[in-house]
Amino acid sequence: MNYTVDDQNMAFISQLYPDVYTQIVQPGEVKQPKRRRKKTKGSVASADGGNGLFRKRKLTDEQVNMLEMSFGDEHKLESERKDRLAAELGLDPRQVAVWFQNRRARWKNKRLEEEYNKLKNSHDNVVVDKCRLESEVIQLKEQLYDAEREIQRLAERVEGGSSNSPISSSVSVEANETPFFGDYKVGDDGDDYDHLFYPVPENSYIDEAEWMSLYI
């Protein structure tokens, strides 16, 4: 029987490396592709960290309500509590942990949105108050300016009226020209006005006509 070079080489290789020979595809043979095993959708590692797989079950309304009630009591999930909830709901502990993790993330996002809305409303109110106060300041400045102009106008009117009044001018002139004691001067010893009085003898009777004649 005649062998080709390839057949001789293959026979030689099979004797030296039997394990390698089994992996070499013979001429004319078709290598069947290996089928990859599909992973179950939604499957994750078991809670104890082993290689076991579980199918993620869709939660019922009752299970969701019980999880929501438990989350309302305490946002953090401890190991004992996780196992107890999983046993009560008939779920895998890992699925309960994932649900709590997602629910806590939504709760934090909601809190951030609420805080943001509160701060935004406070900021808007402060801006409105600021605009209102600025408007009041402008109005008060205008009123102050008008009041200052009115005070200045009244002051100018009073000054102009007092300087041009004829009554005040005549009174001031007469007061300067008329002495307080007339043409008589009053000395310190009183001698200057002794001639205005006439001595009257004691025990003498002077009638009214004679008394008046002394000063006429």
From Swiss-Prot:
<keyword id="KW-0804">Transcription</keyword>
<dbReference type="GO" id="GO:0009733">
    <property type="term" value="P:response to auxin"/>
</dbReference>
<dbReference type="GO" id="GO:0005634">
    <property type="term" value="C:nucleus"/>
</dbReference>
<feature type="DNA-binding region" description="Homeobox">
    <location>
        <begin position="52"/>
        <end position="111"/>
    </location>
</feature>
<dbReference type="GO" id="GO:0003700">
    <property type="term" value="F:DNA-binding transcription factor activity"/>
</dbReference>
<keyword id="KW-0238">DNA-binding</keyword>
<keyword id="KW-0346">Stress response</keyword>
<dbReference type="InterPro" id="IPR001356">
    <property type="entry name" value="HD"/>
</dbReference>
<keyword id="KW-0371">Homeobox</keyword>
<dbReference type="InterPro" id="IPR017970">
    <property type="entry name" value="Homeobox_CS"/>
</dbReference>
<dbReference type="InterPro" id="IPR000047">
    <property type="entry name" value="HTH_motif"/>
</dbReference>
<keyword id="KW-0805">Transcription regulation</keyword>
<dbReference type="InterPro" id="IPR045224">
    <property type="entry name" value="HDZip_class_I_plant"/>
</dbReference>
<dbReference type="GO" id="GO:0000981">
    <property type="term" value="F:DNA-binding transcription factor activity, RNA polymerase II-specific"/>
</dbReference>
<keyword id="KW-0539">Nucleus</keyword>
<comment type="function">
    <text>Probable transcription factor.</text>
</comment>
<feature type="region of interest" description="Disordered">
    <location>
        <begin position="28"/>
        <end position="52"/>
    </location>
</feature>
<dbReference type="InterPro" id="IPR009057">
    <property type="entry name" value="Homeodomain-like_sf"/>
</dbReference>
<dbReference type="GO" id="GO:0000976">
    <property type="term" value="F:transcription cis-regulatory region binding"/>
</dbReference>
<protein>
    <recommendedName>
        <fullName>Homeobox-leucine zipper protein ATHB-40</fullName>
    </recommendedName>
</protein>
<dbReference type="Pfam" id="PF00046">
    <property type="entry name" value="Homeodomain"/>
</dbReference>
<feature type="region of interest" description="Leucine-zipper">
    <location>
        <begin position="112"/>
        <end position="140"/>
    </location>
</feature>
<comment type="similarity">
    <text>Belongs to the HD-ZIP homeobox family. Class I subfamily.</text>
</comment>
